[in-house]
Amino acid sequence: MDEADRQLLRRCRVRLVSELQVAELWDALLSRELFTRDMIEDIQQAGSGSRRDQARQLVTDLETRGRQALPLFISCLEDTGQGTLASLLQSGRQAAKQDPEAVKPLDHLVPVVLGPMGLTAKEQRVVKLDPSQPAVGNLTPVVLGPEELWPARLKPEVLRPETPRPVDIGSGGAHDVCVPGKIRGHADMAYTLDSDPCGHCLIINNVNFCPSSGLGTRTGSNLDRDKLEHRFRWLRFMVEVKNDLTAKKMVTALMEMAHRNHRALDCFVVVILSHGCQASHLQFPGAVYGTDGCSVSIEKIVNIFNGSGCPSLGGKPKLFFIQACGGEQKDHGFEVACTSSQGRTLDSDSEPDAVPYQEGPRPLDQLDAVSSLPTPSDILVSYSTFPGFVSWRDKKSGSWYIETLDGILEQWARSEDLQSLLLRVANAVSAKGTYKQIPGCFNFLRKKLFFKTS
């Protein structure tokens, strides 16, 4: 959906929720393929199932339905005798077209500079946010997406400089700042990964999509799959790989894994390699596509393994690694003076796992209307990119994120905890390419996590 249409919906949200007669809209929404029948059933079950709750969820989900979603919704209102609301939205669209400057973009990037990360001299950067402002040395930049993508109660745990690192590499050597061996021995400071194998790892790799989906072949993804299959076996996981699953089969595979008995194991990992998109959410943003072109929200995937869905994983770390686009924006970054040689230009073999909305509405996004995990714990969801932005994949070497994650795990998993490893991944990936990419994560782990490497 265009930013102007999205803003208009949000400005009119209170009135729409108050006056919208949703019961009369279902057939019209189906006939115009704005939503599938399953999606409408999810909307009807939102909250208490009241008209207001349904209207509220409908307006929220409408933002994910493509560039033509709002004009089609307006025509649905006209066909169901809700002309007053249709006129309200139509006049708002016309006003925005006549005066585009009146609509302040919500996707304006906000550069946020975090403190020193203990980088080596070669990795140090000088970040210049504004030509009129003095440069700031030895800082690591993070480009955050739209503020509204991160609910106030759920600020993502991305690159937190205040978190103690188990190994300080500031001068190129290891210093006993926070010795991993000492932390590993304390159950109140680090998760216990004593079992061997330490847990299951499910890798879902979607490469070939049906022609009707409009989604391209994800050349290079098999390289990502093979790297992570090898890496997590090395980390003492029992790895299972599923290739080219439809959305329904993805959910089935995840639920089958959740129904297993994990009581004798200490950890659990899910890796999903696919195309992705934005999706309405309460906690975890984004969605991934099955090979049939239907999507499954990350929130739904995570909630399959919550306390009620998988009690045998209660209190144990559950890790989700998502290699997929969070949207269609390409991040050009901002000016940096960098001494690192890690950057590389974007060539013809690099392509995004993005799904543009320019083809009109798709009956795709399946949304989890009601979250069953209000206070998530022992969960970490690592995204290859921030919501709203593309995630780059090289046809010859695989995705930037997975290639870097594999290398960091190989080099540092013996000595550093997971959060420190992900900081390294974010720093390395952000240095790549003409277009920029910055991984991030939602971290609800209660302790440090050190992988089992021997």
From Swiss-Prot:
UniProt PTM: Cleavages at Asp-353 by granzyme B and at Asp-368 by caspase-3 generate the two active subunits. Caspase-8 and -10 can also be involved in these processing events. Phosphorylated at Thr-163 by MAPK1/ERK2. Phosphorylation at Thr-163 is sufficient to block caspase-9 processing and subsequent caspase-3 activation. Phosphorylation on Tyr-191 by ABL1/c-Abl; occurs in the response of cells to DNA damage.
Superkingdom of source: Eukaryota
Activity regulation note: Inhibited by BIRC6; following inhibition of BIRC6-caspase binding by DIABLO/SMAC, BIRC6 is subjected to caspase cleavage, leading to an increase in active caspases.
Modified residues annotated as Phosphothreonine in this record: 163
Catalytic activity reported: Strict requirement for an Asp residue at position P1 and with a marked preference for His at position P2. It has a preferred cleavage sequence of Leu-Gly-His-Asp-|-Xaa
One example GO MF annotation: protein kinase binding
Cited CDD domains: CARD_CASP9, CASc
Active site: 275, 325
Pfam families in the record: CARD, Peptidase_C14
The keyword Cell membrane is annotated on this UniProt entry: no
Quaternary assembly: Heterotetramer that consists of two anti-parallel arranged heterodimers, each one formed by a 35 kDa (p35) and a 10 kDa (p10) subunit. Caspase-9 and APAF1 bind to each other via their respective NH2-terminal CED-3 homologous domains in the presence of cytochrome C and ATP. Interacts (inactive form) with EFHD2. Interacts with HAX1. Interacts with BIRC2/c-IAP1, XIAP/BIRC4, BIRC5/survivin, BIRC6/bruce and BIRC7/livin. Interacts with ABL1 (via SH3 domain); the interaction is direct and increased in the response of cells to genotoxic stress and ABL1/c-Abl activation. Interacts with BCL2L10.
Family assignment from sequence similarity: Belongs to the peptidase C14A family.
Protein name per UniProt: Caspase-9
Naturally occurring in which organism (per UniProt): Mus musculus (Mouse)
Gene name of the encoded protein: Casp9
